[in-house]
Amino acid sequence: MQLNPSEISELIKSRISGLGADAEVRNTGTVISVTDGICRVHGLSGVMQGEMLEFPGNTFGLALNLERDSVGAVVLGDYEHISEGDTVKCTGRILEVPVGKELLGRVVNTLGQPIDGKGPINAKETDVIEKVAPGVIARQSVSQPVQTGLKSIDSMVPIGRGQRELIIGDRQTGKTAVAVDAIINQKGKGIFCVYVAIGQKASTIANVVRKLEEHGAMEYTVVVAAAASDSAAMQYLAAYAGCTMGEYFRDRGEDALIVYDDLTKQAWAYRQVSLLLRRPPGREAYPGDVFYLHSRLLERAARVNEEYVENFTKGAVKGKTGSLTALPIIETQAGDVSAFVPTNVISITDGQIFLETDLFNAGIRPAINAGISVSRVGGAAQTKVVKNLSGGIRTDLAQYRELAAFAQFASDLDDATRKQLERGRRVTELLKQAQYQPQQVWQLAASLFAANNGFLDNVEVKDILPFEKGLHDHLKTKYADLVNRIEETKVLSKEDEPALRAAIEDFRKSAAF
C-alpha cells in the first residue's frame, strides 16, 4: 500500500481544524484533610475570604481561613463523601441565598432550600448573606411602633420599627413565646416577619411553624431553620441568611421584623467552627471576634430614610422609609447576665426585655422584670394613647416589687404602703396574659385607663382578668364607635375620655365584680 503525502497532510489538517480547544480556567486545589466538617485545602491561590468552594458531589463549602500554604474551609452540608486528594474548585462567588416574597409561608434551611415538602421555591433574586450595614446618613430615627400585642411590653418597654430589642432570660422562661406572639400580632399590619431558629430541636421548630399556621401568620412569615442536627457552620450562618431575607423588604420601602432564636447557640456554633479551624481561643474559649459576629449582624437592623430606598430601587419607590426590626434572643445560665455573650449583645442592642424564672414559676407570664427591662429608643415610637396612660405603670411595678420584699418581714404597715401593695398586686395581675392572645391598642388603653382611675381597686385580685375580659366585651358590643375611634387615631381625646369613663362605670354597675 502506497501512501500519498498530500492525503496524509489533508487528513492532519482536517483533524487540526476539527480540534475543540475549549478550556475552563478554574482555580483548583486539593483536599489535604477532612475532620468534623472542616477541610484543609492545598492550592486555591486566588480564593477570597467567604468565597463558596465547590467540592465533589455537588457539595459547597465556605473559605474562612486563608493561610500561607493552605485554606481552611467549612463544608455546608454532608462531608462524609469527601476524601483526601479530592479536587476543590473556586466559584468566584460569595455565599448567596434566595430572597423575595416567594419565600413567604415557607420553611427553608440556611441556604434558602425548602425543607417543608411543599415543592421548589421560584425566587427571582438572590443576595449575598454578608452585607455592610446602612451608614449613619442613610438611617432615620425610630418613630413608628411595632405592636407586640403583649400588654407588659407595649406599655413598659415599647418597640419601634428599626429597633433592636433583646429578649434575655434563662431556659424555659417564655422567650420564644414572646417573639412568636409578636409575629402573630403583625397580621394585617403590613410587617413581614422572618423567624430564624438556630440549634433548636426539629420538633420545637415544627411546633412553632404549626402555631404560626394556626393563627394565619405564615402568610407573611419566612422560617429559616438550622436545627440541632445541622452542622455548626449551618447554625452559625443561619442568622445572616435570615437577615438578608429581611433586608429585601427593608431596602424596598417595606417594614420587616426578624427574630433570632437564639444567638447564644449561634455563638456556640461559631466557637466550635473557630476552634476546629485552630483559631486562638479567648474568654470562655470564644474567638476574639465574637463581638463582631453579633454586632455586624444586629447593625443591619435599622430604619432607612426615603433617599436610601429611592436610590436602592433606582427611583421605583419614592417617599417611603424601610425598616428591619430585630428581636434577638439570648439564653442565660442561672440568670447570669454578666457572662461574655449576654453583655456583648446587651451593649449592641437598643434595650432588653429581661424574663425571670421566679416570676415565671409564680404564674406571672410573660415573666418580665419591670426593673431591669428597658427600651432605649422605643419611647419615641410608642402610640400616644398608651404613652399617656402607661406612665405610672412601670414605676408602680418596680416600687411594688421592692415593697413586697420588705413587707414579708414587716407586720404593721402604714396605709400608704398597704395601698401601694394592693395597687401593685392588681397591676401585676392585669399585665398577665395568655399565650397566642395578643391585644389591640384600644384593649390595652381601656385596661390601663381602668387601672389608673381606680376602677380595679375594689375588684378582687383573682377577678382582675375576668373583669378585663368582660370590660373588653362590653366596650366592643355597646361602644363600638368609641373603640374604633381609639384604634384608628391611637389617641384618647378629651371628648372620648369622659365617654370611656362612663362606659367603664356602666360595666361596673352591670357586672358582678
Curated annotation (Swiss-Prot):
<keyword id="KW-0406">Ion transport</keyword>
<dbReference type="InterPro" id="IPR005294">
    <property type="entry name" value="ATP_synth_F1_asu"/>
</dbReference>
<dbReference type="InterPro" id="IPR020003">
    <property type="entry name" value="ATPase_a/bsu_AS"/>
</dbReference>
<dbReference type="Pfam" id="PF00006">
    <property type="entry name" value="ATP-synt_ab"/>
</dbReference>
<dbReference type="Pfam" id="PF00306">
    <property type="entry name" value="ATP-synt_ab_C"/>
</dbReference>
<protein>
    <recommendedName>
        <fullName>ATP synthase subunit alpha</fullName>
        <ecNumber>7.1.2.2</ecNumber>
    </recommendedName>
</protein>
<keyword id="KW-0472">Membrane</keyword>
<keyword id="KW-0139">CF(1)</keyword>
<dbReference type="InterPro" id="IPR000793">
    <property type="entry name" value="ATP_synth_asu_C"/>
</dbReference>
<dbReference type="GO" id="GO:0005886">
    <property type="term" value="C:plasma membrane"/>
</dbReference>
<keyword id="KW-0813">Transport</keyword>
<keyword id="KW-0067">ATP-binding</keyword>
<feature type="binding site">
    <location>
        <begin position="169"/>
        <end position="176"/>
    </location>
    <ligand>
        <name>ATP</name>
    </ligand>
</feature>
<keyword id="KW-1278">Translocase</keyword>
<keyword id="KW-0547">Nucleotide-binding</keyword>
<dbReference type="InterPro" id="IPR023366">
    <property type="entry name" value="ATP_synth_asu-like_sf"/>
</dbReference>
<feature type="site" description="Required for activity">
    <location>
        <position position="373"/>
    </location>
</feature>
<dbReference type="GO" id="GO:0005524">
    <property type="term" value="F:ATP binding"/>
</dbReference>
<dbReference type="Pfam" id="PF02874">
    <property type="entry name" value="ATP-synt_ab_N"/>
</dbReference>
<dbReference type="GO" id="GO:0046933">
    <property type="term" value="F:proton-transporting ATP synthase activity, rotational mechanism"/>
</dbReference>
<comment type="similarity">
    <text>Belongs to the ATPase alpha/beta chains family.</text>
</comment>
<keyword id="KW-0997">Cell inner membrane</keyword>
<dbReference type="InterPro" id="IPR000194">
    <property type="entry name" value="ATPase_F1/V1/A1_a/bsu_nucl-bd"/>
</dbReference>
<keyword id="KW-1003">Cell membrane</keyword>
<keyword id="KW-0066">ATP synthesis</keyword>
<dbReference type="InterPro" id="IPR004100">
    <property type="entry name" value="ATPase_F1/V1/A1_a/bsu_N"/>
</dbReference>
<dbReference type="InterPro" id="IPR027417">
    <property type="entry name" value="P-loop_NTPase"/>
</dbReference>
<comment type="subunit">
    <text>F-type ATPases have 2 components, CF(1) - the catalytic core - and CF(0) - the membrane proton channel. CF(1) has five subunits: alpha(3), beta(3), gamma(1), delta(1), epsilon(1). CF(0) has three main subunits: a(1), b(2) and c(9-12). The alpha and beta chains form an alternating ring which encloses part of the gamma chain. CF(1) is attached to CF(0) by a central stalk formed by the gamma and epsilon chains, while a peripheral stalk is formed by the delta and b chains.</text>
</comment>
<dbReference type="InterPro" id="IPR038376">
    <property type="entry name" value="ATP_synth_asu_C_sf"/>
</dbReference>
<dbReference type="GO" id="GO:0043531">
    <property type="term" value="F:ADP binding"/>
</dbReference>
<keyword id="KW-0375">Hydrogen ion transport</keyword>
<dbReference type="InterPro" id="IPR036121">
    <property type="entry name" value="ATPase_F1/V1/A1_a/bsu_N_sf"/>
</dbReference>
<dbReference type="InterPro" id="IPR033732">
    <property type="entry name" value="ATP_synth_F1_a_nt-bd_dom"/>
</dbReference>
<dbReference type="GO" id="GO:0045259">
    <property type="term" value="C:proton-transporting ATP synthase complex"/>
</dbReference>
<comment type="function">
    <text>Produces ATP from ADP in the presence of a proton gradient across the membrane. The alpha chain is a regulatory subunit.</text>
</comment>
